[in-house]
């Protein structure tokens, strides 16, 4: 059985983008933000973000960049009116880009399981530990992707989930470096 801890928040990956969004800056203000916009087409989520920009703002990412509307792009990447990547676990992000498709980290575990952990009956057993607020997203993603990968690899997946215990959560700190805890 392949065991996968999949509750890790992606918010840390976007720390600089959150800081930029909350700053007074109107244009990229550090090397990371500049690189994000210069290299934007290389991100696996680029096409999905571009579709959201067109749907929500009526303009492509390129048009928004041309108009210096950087924060609109960041907002649509990070928040629920767009891709909501600032609130999702890393496993649900479009993370790996291939010539014809993209995969989430979650799907990469399905692929790895098929390649390395299938048994003599071509069954693949994978267990994911997830956060309670994301379990339904993982289950929906699994159901949308499972047929494709069972067919591709000629395997049968047996995927289970459990909830990560709050006692194992990572300590959260604010922008000032001081630990904090929400009431919930």
Tell me what each language-model feature is.
Residues 1-184:
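Domain-scale recognition of functional cores that engage charged ligands
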């Amino acid at each position: 059985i392949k065991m996968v801890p999949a509750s890790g928040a992606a918010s840390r990956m976007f720390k600089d983008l959150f800081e930029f969004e909350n700053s007074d800056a109107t244009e990229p203000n550090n090397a990371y933000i500049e690189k994000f916009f210069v290299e934007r087409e290389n991100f696996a989520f680029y096409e999905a973000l571009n579709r959201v920009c067109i749907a929500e703002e009526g303009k492509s990412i390129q048009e928004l960049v041309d108009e210096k509307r950087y924060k609109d792009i960041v907002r649509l990447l990070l928040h629920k009116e767009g891709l909501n990547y600032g609130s999702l676990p890393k496993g649900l992000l479009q993370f790996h880009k291939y010539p014809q498709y993209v995969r989430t980290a979650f799907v990469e575990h399905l692929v790895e399981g098929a390649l390395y952990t299938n048994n003599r009956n071509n069954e693949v057993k994978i267990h994911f530990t997830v956060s309670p607020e994301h379990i339904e997203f993982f289950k929906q993603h699994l159901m949308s992707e499972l047929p494709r990968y069972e067919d591709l690899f000629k395997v049968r997946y047996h995927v289970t989930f459990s909830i990560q215990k709050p006692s194992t959560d990572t300590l959260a700190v604010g922008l000032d470096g001081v630990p904090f805890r929400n009431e919930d």
